Amino acid sequence: MSSSVKTPALEELVPGSEEKPKGRSPLSWGSLFGHRSEKIVFAKSDGGTDENVLTVTITETTVIESDLGVWSSRALLYLTLWFFFSFCTLFLNKYILSLLGGEPSMLGAVQMLSTTVIGCVKTLVPCCLYQHKARLSYPPNFLMTMLFVGLMRFATVVLGLVSLKNVAVSFAETVKSSAPIFTVIMSRMILGEYTGLLVNLSLIPVMGGLALCTATEISFNVLGFSAALSTNIMDCLQNVFSKKLLSGDKYRFSAPELQFYTSAAAVAMLVPARVFFTDVPVIGRSGKSFSYNQDVVLLLLTDGVLFHLQSVTAYALMGKISPVTFSVASTVKHALSIWLSVIVFGNKITSLSAVGTALVTVGVLLYNKARQHQQEALQSLAAATGRAPDDTVEPLLPQDPRQHP
């Protein structure tokens, strides 16, 4: 006899499932990098007519942090390395583009080619961060999907380099830190994701701070500002489609796999594009002549390796902490990049620009905490609804064994 079993009854049989803490206020936002655990949702499954087997399938994949979260030794190591490689890549990009007169498209091509070659080596040689497993089958639209995501990834890199070439590092990083605004818009348009009142209110200081930085920035440039905003839009689109590829039910790609395939697709599209636009002025090109001597080639190769290491450590960190914690860490990285650029490059900023930078940073932090609060509230509501008694469903075991001899 086959029985239909509700989801809450199955959760008690799963080892390691965690109940939400009782007595916690729904408005409590917790610590900045606090531990977050999420329940795995199980679907009911009925056996066949001649079977008494109950099949449990996972219908929703969630990311669960370790008990220490970002404060674990391995996560702290990945966080430190990610910050270090990001800062090195950012400042080396600015040096090559501004002081040496490099082209954003050329530097982006070097970065994509470098991460493709290194990613190919990683798929053949096991390393400490990733053990590649051979894939038996690929989705039918694999090539078109990778070409599309690869195009968005390459456009994100090139547009980011164009913004670095035309505006100060501090201003470019401030504009990039406004990405949550575009995340909300893209999630609503593509995924139909709902955002609550607290999330929408948290965007006000982000937009206000960005307006102050834009109005008072000494090195403001329309091309650089437009490129930075376009980077956010392309990055949000890339993240949405990458999320679908990373969380698919039948064809699920690992993060290093997706990084390699999209980089290879970007390089494949880059070659004909460079040939076709050979005589067309490159976006962001200055009047300086760019000579390729031994030192410049060494700098370009170093930049490509640093770009790949930045991506690898970011993926490794994402595997240890939740996406919300990763987003908060990314916000902290943007804030540190802004002020380190002021120290390293001596960028002049006005008092209003400093206030705008602080407003953007605080607003993005509030946005991430509001998103976390919204997710916890929805999970609490779902758990309360799931625990409600339902007399119409027959229990898995009889409540009184004496009634069923």
Curated annotation (Swiss-Prot):
The chain crosses the membrane at residues 81-101, 106-126, 142-162, 167-187, 195-215, 219-241, 264-284, 296-316, 326-346, 347-367. Signal peptide: none annotated. Its main location: membrane. It is found in: Membrane. The keyword Membrane applies. Residues 1-28, 380-405 are annotated as: Disordered. Keywords: Membrane, Transmembrane, Transmembrane helix. It holds the Pfam family TPT. One of its GO terms (biological process) is blastocyst hatching. It is a multi-pass membrane protein. GO terms for molecular function: antiporter activity. It comes from the Eukaryota. GO terms for cellular component: Golgi apparatus; membrane. Putative transporter. Belongs to the TPT transporter family. SLC35E subfamily. This is Solute carrier family 35 member E2B. It comes from Homo sapiens (Human).
